[in-house]
Amino acid sequence: MIRFFAFVLFFATQELILCNNLPCDASDIAYEEITTQAGTQTNTFCDCQTETYKFSTGTSTDKQTTTVKYKCKKIRACVYAQKCGSLDVKPEENVLSTFCTCADGQVCHDTPEYADETRTFGDTKYHSFVCT
């Protein structure tokens, strides 16, 4: 009976951990992707306020399972006239990137009409932004 309750408690705790959607701390793993022959499963542990980066990749000894863990990028404060972000407008997608955080009272816009600089290469437009 004790084992049954221990199992139920363990399962419930895991579900709470995977569904909490709390903001990530700097050292937290945000999510992991586990790929097997059956497909890919994603376990989300917390929500990043920034973009993520691949932190580690592990492969099981039998080469049947690969686990990739992701953390949140650390965004530093912007210095004077530094590019705070960019928007790459491509035919198939738009990619918004953040490079640093603006000081209180300033904002890093994310629409082309507020771009500090715009360049076109092929069928892609690159817009960059500074804090205003």
UniProtKB/Swiss-Prot annotation:
PTM: Contains 5 disulfide bonds.
GO molecular function, one term: toxin activity
Subcellular location: Secreted
Tissue expression profile of the protein: Expressed by the venom gland.
Chief location bin: secreted
Keyword ATP-binding annotated: no
GO cellular component: extracellular region
Annotated signal peptide: 1-19
Entry keyword Nuclease: no
Keywords: Disulfide bond, Secreted, Signal, Toxin
Superkingdom of the organism of origin: Eukaryota
Family stated for the protein in its record: Belongs to the scoloptoxin-11 family.
Protein's name according to its UniProt entry: U-scoloptoxin(11)-Sa1a
Origin organism lineage: Eukaryota, Metazoa, Ecdysozoa, Arthropoda, Myriapoda
